[in-house]
Amino acid sequence: MTETTASQVRPVLSPWLQDQLTQLLARRGHAWLLQGPSGLGQYTLGLELARAWLCEAPTQQGACYQCRSCHAVDVRTQADLRTLMPEALALELNWPLDEKTQKDLDDKKRKPSKEIRVEAARDMVAFSQQTRSGGATKVVFIYPAERMNHVTANTLLKTLEEPPGECRFVLASEAAHQLLPTIRSRCQNHTMTWPTESQALRWLQTQGLPLADAAVLLRAAGGRPEDALDLANAGLKAAHWAVLPKAVMRGDVGAVSDATPTQAIATLQKICHDLLALRMGAEPRFFMGADLPTAGTTVSLTQWSKDLMDAARTCEHPYNAGLMFEALVARAQTALRAKE
């Protein structure tokens, strides 16, 4: 099999990501922080930037997708690329873990971490000091960067500021405000570009969504196309989304019980947000106005919003998910039925 046939054909990036990749490749800098809310493509852009830096025949638009380096990135064996991710996310995205970590997980000594562990950061420091395997540079890709705790982040500081030899960094974050200021100050910042609605809808259609469904789910995701696609892949139907607010007001627990507790709370927060927006004379963001009940008071909705934020902090390990859904919907009804 030839090198070319073994490699992927260059994928078509969404236009808003391709424009950003071209801009970043034209600029200098050994460390970039890609920041913005979820659903705008930080992971995709970060990986494409790393791939292009490592490519043997890059263009102004990015990597060639034909060389040995590009193929090695595809199959997760590029020796000059090190990814720092929470173990749970690395497994989900098919990135290999180090031998000891994998053995610990296989032996069920512990569960995959949801944070970037300090041991991984120490391994990265050692990686940065190693000789390159053959390319022009080495690359460290950290995602989501906000999953580093203070100990992990502090382990990176000196290497991030003064990397030994040719080593470049790309940090991608969906909550950059949670990063240590010292981490942010050592990076050049790039704020992710929001696509236009028409760009996002066209992209969602290329992913297989009918236009009508794409429009509803894009709204449900607050205009973030990758989040909209995640909602579709999770099984959310446009028709179900439209009837959710009034179903919750009726006390229909089944309207949210198919979701995880985290997802259910996020949905209720969107209902609460839009109802508060209407109370303030603004346009709703996540639902059509006709799909929202005329319900609640400014005081009751504000308190409900605070209660939902409290619930979000403790929802990952409910004693009984069914009882939690019932409590969430009952609390919603209390807020929605309040009178002036």
Predicted regions and their residues:
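Charged, glycine-rich active-site and insertion segments that engage polyanionic ligands
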Residues: M1-A52, Q60-Q61, R68-S69, G165-R168, ...
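Clamp-loader machinery-focused feature within the broader ASCE/P-loop NTPase space
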Residues: T2-V151
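Conserved adenine-binding aromatic site and its adjacent loop/helix in ATP-hydrolyzing domains
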Residues: A126, K158, S185
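Conserved catalytic/switch belt of AAA+ P-loop NTPases
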Residues: Q129, N154-R168
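Residues immediately C-terminal
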Residues: R147-M148, E162, Q178
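Short N-terminal helix/helix-N-cap motif within the alpha/beta-hydrolase-1
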Residues: H150-A153, R337
